[in-house]
Every structure is written in structure tokens, then in C-alpha cells.
């Protein structure tokens, strides 16, 4: 505010800037920024997505193991082939697909969290190219959640196996 304060010292420029941004544009004013808007808020969101993804992935791995130990049975779907060598077998493919989508989402989240807060003298436009991939990071996460939900919907508890192992 140095130059403009010299010309108009009677105006509270920080307050005037805040009022202008919030009233005319309807966004939250950020008083501590350089020539470009910081991307800290995006990094926090991406880190939150990654943490949630890790919970989903952990559930996927646990369900895969519970299915392999026969604590859960998968309900076969008419017309679906489980395996090329054992068509009668039902693979936990939904959980495996979810894991893969979590890995892709997390890779993008980490990469974007590392890239977005950096700028070359506030003149760097590479953040705009990077931000075009936010949809991919969120999309892979949503696909992972969807696959896990679909996998869980195909599972039933194998009470006989649980009782057998507990006795």
C-alpha cells in the first residue's frame, strides 16, 4: 500500500481492500498473500482426501483378507465370471479396483500438494496446469469409494466359519 498511501493517506487501505473484495466479489479476503493467491487451502483439502483414501484402502485390504479367510462370502452375480481359470470363483475385484483408484488419487494429491504452494517469483503459471488435474484426484477417490461400497454390498458374513474358528 506504500504508493497509494502516499497519495491518499487519509484512507485505511487494508480495510478498504477487504471491503472491496468481500462486498463486490463475495469471497473471503486474504490479507497475507503475494501477487497470486496462495494454494494452502487446496493443500489442506488434498491432504484430507488422501487421509480419507487411506481409510478406504485399509478397509479394502481388510475385506480382501476376510474374504480369503472365508469370514465373508461374496454373493455371486448372475452372468459375471470370476476368473478365467475358475469361472465359478468370485474374486474380490471391487476391493482391488478401489485400492488401485486410491493409489492413483493419493499420488495426484501428494503431487499437487507439493506443487501448488510453490511459485517462481509469483510469475509462474504452472499452477494452472496442475490445477486442471484436481478433478482427476477427486474422481479417482470417488471411484474408489464407489467400488468399496459395491464390494461391501456383495458381501455377507459367514457365521459358520466364524463360529468354527472361535471354537
Q: How would you name each of these model-derived features?
A:
Residues 71, 83-167:
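Glycine-rich cofactor/substrate-binding loops
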Residues 1-118:
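Internal glycine-rich alpha/beta core junctions
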Amino acid at each position: 500500500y506504500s504508493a497509494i498511501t502516499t497519495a491518499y493517506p487519509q484512507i485505511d487501505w487494508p480495510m478498504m481492500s477487504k471491503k472491496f473484495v468481500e462486498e463486490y466479489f463475495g469471497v473471503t479476503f486474504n490479507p497475507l498473500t503475494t501477487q497470486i493467491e496462495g494454494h494452502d487451502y487446496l493443500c489442506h483439502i488434498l491432504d484430507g482426501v488422501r487421509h480419507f483414501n487411506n481409510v478406504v484402502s485399509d478397509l479394502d485390504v481388510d475385506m480382501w483378507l476376510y474374504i480369503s479367510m472365508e469370514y465373508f462370502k461374496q454373493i455371486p452375480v448372475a452372468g459375471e465370471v470370476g476368473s478365467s481359470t475358475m469361472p465359478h470363483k468370485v474374486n474380490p475385484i471391487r476391493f482391488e479396483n478401489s485400492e488401485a483408484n486410491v493409489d492413483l488419487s493419493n499420488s495426484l494429491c501428494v503431487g499437487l500438494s507439493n506443487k501448488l504452494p510453490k511459485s517462481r517469483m509469483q510469475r509462474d503459471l504452472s499452477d494452472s496446469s496442475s490445477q486442471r488435474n484436481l478433478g482427476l484426484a477427486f474422481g479417482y477417490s470417488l471411484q474408489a469409494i464407489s467400488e468399496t461400497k459395491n464390494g461391501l454390498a456383495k458381501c455377507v458374513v459367514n457365521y459358520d466359519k466364524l463360529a468354527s474358528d472361535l471354537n
